[in-house]
């Protein structure tokens, strides 16, 4: 589907290892979503979900059809069989304790570019 509700938002995900540089592991776009947000909202409500003003609706993993646009480490590392090489030479099949995951997004047209900033989190060991 390629309608006007499929927003053109560039997305980027990076992993920063402890005391190291970050590596961009995914560049995708929100327009790659199979269902747009209007369709996802309709799907929720038709199945009885009581959506109310202020509720947060999340899209889930956003993946493209090219390897650089895969949206999860399971896809990026091909179920752990193809590790990615980090800037220091170490490899990752999945995210490790101590890694920082960084996500960024921007949208633009011919006249203006809007940045959504970045969100990042440090992956802590399980208790």
Across the structure, where does each feature detected by a protein language model lie?
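Catalytic-pocket segment enriched in acidic/His residues
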Residues: 1-127
